[in-house]
Amino acid sequence: MSEPLKPRIDFEQPLQSLDEPVLKSAQAFDEQAAEKFYPAAQELDAEDEEGRVEGLVNAALKPKRSLWRKMVTAGMVILGASVIAQSVQWVNQAWQQQDWIALGATTAGGLIILAGVGSVVTEWRRLYHLRQRAEERDIARALLVSHGVGQGRVFCEKLARQAGLDQGHPALQRWQASLHETHNDREVVELYAKLVQPALDNQARAEISRYAAESALMIAVSPLALVDMAFIAWRNIRLINRIAALYGIELGYFSRIRLFRLVLLNIAFAGASELVREVGMDWLSQDLAARLSARAAQGIGAGLLTARLGIKAMELCRPLPWLEGDKPKLGDFRRQLMNQLKNTLPKKDKTAH
């Protein structure tokens, strides 16, 4: 038995056509625009912010090539050659005329100029090493997604030499014993990051903990705000120098200023959101007013800022990018600071009474 046919359904409105996506026109990039282009990482939102900050850091580290800079460089070269030629002529004339005063003055001026040129070359070399560290992180990122063989071990051995690790170092020996000829570049770099790099990272973490604790205690017990500010600034600069030395970077005057500026730039872009994400909920879940005084709470804040500065200095001085779970957390330093303050301040009160 067949089922009865259903009645016809008439639609009053016509069918709507699908909206076709509007495609943007092709855009060509010149050489200057290509230098400022950095691909976006398809990762989580928190990591997108870090990638954007890393792109800004790379852009700040890269020297900007422009026509004016080339013209100034050419002018400086011509001026230097002219000064050298004129100095040689003055020395020759003074020697022929036996003008010993002019000869001595010319020699002294030449020594001063040589000392200045030597210091400039030394500063440029140190600044170049700081820029090279950012390029090494880019190479490490490429090797961490590479399936090739041979480049990873050479790259890691170069990093070990830069860090001052000899062949007899236990961490380096464990890494070499774990290598196999079937390992690709990604596996070799990951083994280095897990076996060798923590030997330097642990030293940097210990330095950050020590400097953060000293800053927190200084703010908590000192009644002079101006002295506190000067002490914190001096200790923060020393912390950056210490971390750079641990990772094999020798800082000069300009490279130290560049690194300090990059650390502050990094903190300004990613500091507030990360501080709230890592510390905020844990901080609000505790009754700090019942545990510590207002002055001690200010000390914890200063210590956390020092720790934040040290973490970003680590990030800029490390030759390898952070792997999953390796990056230090502000919450760990906060717990250490609170324990140290709770153990130190009562002792000071008892001794005072």
From Swiss-Prot:
One of the record's GO cellular component terms: plasma membrane
Keywords: Cell inner membrane, Cell membrane, Membrane, Transmembrane, Transmembrane helix
Subcellular location: Cell inner membrane
Keyword match Transcription: no
Topological relation to the membrane, as annotated: Multi-pass membrane protein
Top-level taxon of origin: Bacteria
Coiled-coil positions: none
Pfam family, one: DUF697
Main location: membrane
Transmembrane segments: 71-91, 101-121, 214-234
Record NCBIfam families: hyp_HI0043 (TIGR01620)
Family: Belongs to the UPF0283 family.
Entries under PANTHER family matching the protein: UPF0283 MEMBRANE PROTEIN YCJF
Protein name: UPF0283 membrane protein YpsIP31758_1791
Organism in which the protein naturally occurs: Yersinia pseudotuberculosis serotype O:1b (strain IP 31758)
